[in-house]
Amino acid sequence: MAEEVKFSPYEDAVAGLVVQILGRTGIAGEVTQVKIKILEGRDKGRVLTRNVKGPVRLGDIVMLRETEREARRITAR
């Protein structure tokens, strides 16, 4: 009998700590732009700007699939 292999969606994810909330973005304000400090992995200690969908507050831990991309700054038109 073959052994079943289960893949977790967080298998390759890296933990990051929300250190600052920059503002809301998106057409209806459904996305929050935050600064995240990487807690583990190759980029440990690096601070990224990312967009987070859903509720988020200071001190939350978010799981990032990759740590290469950064969000563009929110600019007023």
Swiss-Prot record:
Keywords: Ribonucleoprotein, Ribosomal protein. GO terms for molecular function: structural constituent of ribosome. One of its GO terms (cellular component) is cytosolic small ribosomal subunit. GO terms for biological process: maturation of SSU-rRNA; ribosomal small subunit assembly; translation. It comes from the Archaea. Belongs to the eukaryotic ribosomal protein eS28 family. This is Small ribosomal subunit protein eS28. The gene is rps28e.
